[in-house]
């Protein structure tokens, strides 16, 4: 099983890698992986692998797919992949590192393929699951939320359209807290509004936000 963990750092998406000890540059780093133990569900296995790699539990973890074929041994295997998220600012523990996604081309083909599949899985679910909020603290500004959506989607979003879509989807609620941003203007803080607080569950229409 492979676990592809992402976070946002310096305005870009990063993926967590673990050192292999291999002298070959392309195989020096790889995705966190492991085998399913006896009596363990695949969800439990993914969580264990993620915890071992991160040093803490991810804030989002979901199955991204599976594929057959030879992996790291000569025997045919079925590899299950999970994608996960860690909050902004999560450090890499000893023996691991956060690699900018733009540099993933230096990895082995099998790892690049898993990363691509995991990103596609996240983007397919982002408009109907609170995935973007898993990268943020409990309260945040709308600018911070938009930045996270842009990082995950890999494209810019129109500010006014983004906020109208958030309002229509009713997925955030205002708090009484404010924070001064870079330009010195106070910005109101918001929090994620769980489904039980919403009268409807409309998704965020990103096809309208170009």
Each PLM stretch: what is its role?
Residues 174-210:
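Long, intrinsically disordered, low-complexity Ser/Thr/Pro-rich regulatory/activation regions
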Residues 5-7, 17, 83-85, 189-191:
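Short, well-ordered beta-strand micro-motif
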Residues 1-29:
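N-terminal strand-loop-strand
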Residues 31-39, 134:
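Short histidine-centered catalytic/ligand-binding loop motif
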Residues 1, 14, 43-47, 51-92, ...:
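Active-site segment of metal-dependent pyrophosphate-handling enzymes
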Residues 147-156:
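Short helix-coil junctions and helix-kink-helix linkers
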Residues 81-84, 91-126, 138-143, 148, ...:
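NUDIX/MutT-family hydrolases
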